[in-house]
Amino acid sequence: MRGVYWVLAVVLLLVLGFCACAGKPNPREQAQSTTQAARQESVTSGADEAPAATQAEQPAEEDSTEPTPAETEADVQQSIPQTGMSVPVTQTYTQPAEHSGQVVALTYESRDYAGDGEEIEKTTYVYLPYGYEESGDTRYDILYLMHGWYGSAGEYFFIGNGMIKNVLDHMIENGEIKPMIVVSASFYHDGSDTDFGSSVAALRAFHSDFENHLMPAVEGTYRTYAASASDADLRASRDHRAFGGFSLGSVTTWMQFCYDYDYIRYFLPMSGSCWYYGGFGDFRTKQNVDFIQSLVEDNDLDRRGYFIYHAVGTRDSVKEQTLLQAEEMLARPEIFTPAHYVFFQKEGGVHDHNAVMEFLYNALPLFFDSKEFTKQEAPKK
């Protein structure tokens, strides 16, 4: 009988131990559950929104700091990851979609702002989402994209057999982002002078082309949220405008933040840092972040709203300079909160358009008050 009692005692201990373990969440599963929940929640509306984060390796941390003005005005403030790894693009998205948007060329008048200021003609390329022509008076959010060194207008739509355009088509088709207009622009005049120094001079001057010519030409032609192409109406519609770029296009994106925060709310700098002060090999990181912070504070951007999705590949040739700025910005959490700044990396990503495609795939659902969809929630074709 004693042996039977011993056996029963051992079994009882095993059962109790199993129940205790079952009651404790697995840390990895808990992190995944927390992040997935963040992806499924809607962002808050207006200037006090906190965009939902893409899936990251770590769970959201509790915010113990004093709430910002945007947080105190919001009914619900999400706790989201501020850093992590981006999610790979669904493999089939690089192939043509059933419902495909169209790309059209638009020629507009400008000036050679990096040169003698002479009048010139430039061409940009515009992606119109599927159904644009039949959508009546529907207005669309708009994203401007800038290429890197040696790049050209339209390259985002044509590189890799149109893989980036295909991703846009699929994301819109499956309800992961709202239909939007996308512009693939250039800081070059005609592409004849593409040495590095001239390229940097051109991107530094691009904001004048953007403000005075490109933006009015595009938004005076296509139906965006700007009531007209007037400067006042373009400023009034900043909540519906985004700007992103890769490599020197990332540098351009930071310049756009510095000059054109009155016109643009969402920013996507990919593989690059701010060169408002300094330049390549002279990365004045603290001085540039100090300046960005002063723009935020002096222009009430915390209340008005802005969001930066900063990204780089883990094997990118410009990772060091990008990380320097990210670390400096993340070290100022009272200014650059997760509602305003996030930094994500592509695992194994190098300096190419595959990384760009992944960053767009991760960032765009966070722009323009887009509702987040999981793959299961996306409408079927």
Question: Where on the chain are the PLM-derived regions?
Answer:
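Positively charged n-region of N-terminal signal peptides that target proteins for export
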Residues: 1-10
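C-terminal motif of bacterial Sec signal peptides marking the signal peptidase cleavage site
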Residues: 17-20
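Non-catalytic cap/lid and distal C-terminal segments of serine-dependent acyl enzymes
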Residues: 36-40, 46, 55, 61-381
